[in-house]
Design a protein with these regions (language model features):
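Cysteine-dependent hydrolase recognition
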Residues: 1-273
């Protein structure tokens, strides 16, 4: 409320938060990263109910088209002098000057669990086999997801040759027909085993939605409750659709569940929303 009072005339406006961050950036000359602690949704006026909009999130002006609409915290990092509207145009887009992250907690307990999880992670030593990298890839689409994963793995091997690689490609595992849909219990088991044994990073390329990776449901948000406690929490990178969505007042995405789960899941995610 203090930020809204000083930079937004008392109104809960995302520009008030952005302008406060910009002031700190330009006056202090030291600000490099900002972490937002609290859920944000597209329900600015709190008309729909559901989860609270604790720290609002930027929503694109084209908010009704399912292919062009998006929400993003990047807006808070656009702090150049004279910058007003976000043009939302790749050809003339503004530059992020600081890193922006968000912990979409909706309660004190969730925030506390995340903090304890992070402190425990930072105290851990980087040891093998935990210091391995895992590459998870979908099938279909003429093998493009596997090819992309191979490119990522090659780049990491060149830059960091001391890491061991684990490649979990869906085409390697048997699929079965269940009720007219394809599933792969073998691939699902392989993912859980790899995460349980420890991996520093998990990189996924393929199809997905808010709660699931792959049409074969190899990773689902609802499975997380059955995962064992993990000794090494991975950083997740997911090149897919909506897995990291966190602007809904009703649905909690798999990325949110992974981040806020106690003693399991993910230490952080770079995901698409």
């Amino acid at each position: 409320s203090e930020i809204y009072d000083s930079h937004g005339y008392g109104n809960p406006d995302i520009s008030a938060i952005r302008n406060f961050i910009a002031q700190e950036y330009h006056e202090g000359k030291q600000l490099k990263n900002v972490l937002l602690l609290g859920k944000g949704t597209f329900d600015y006026k709190k008309k729909l109910g559901g989860r609270p909009n604790l720290i609002p999130i930027y929503t694109s002006r084209s908010s009704l088209d399912p292919l062009t609409t998006y929400s993003s915290d990047d807006y808070f990092g656009l702090v150049d002098w004279g910058l007003g509207n976000w043009e939302e145009d790749a050809t003339g887009d503004a530059t992020l000057r600081i890193g922006i992250g968000r912990i979409p907690a909706i309660s004190y307990v969730e925030a506390k669990n995340w903090l304890e999880k992070t402190i425990a992670y930072e105290k851990q030593e980087l040891v093998f086999p935990s210091s391995s990298l895992t590459f998870l890839a979908d099938d279909g689409d003429n093998g493009v997801h596997m090819r992309d994963s191979e490119v990522h793995a090659a780049l990491m091997k060149e830059a960091h040759p001391f890491f061991k690689h684990h490649k979990l490609y869906l085409d390697r595992y048997e699929q079965i027909n269940v009720g007219g849909a394809q599933e792969s219990p073998e691939a699902k088991k392989a993912v859980v085993e790899r995460i349980s044994q420890g991996t520093l990073l998990l990189n996924y390329v393929g199809h997905g939605n808010e709660t699931t990776l792959m049409a074969e449901e190899v990773v689902q948000a609802q499975d997380l409750q059955n995962w064992p406690q993990q000794t090494q929490l991975p950083l997740w990178f997911t090149a897919t659709c909506e897995f990291g969505r966190h602007d809904s007042p009703f649905l909690r995405s798999a990325a949110e569940e992974l981040l806020l789960a106690s003693d399991k899941g993910a230490i952080g995610l770079l995901a698409t929303g």
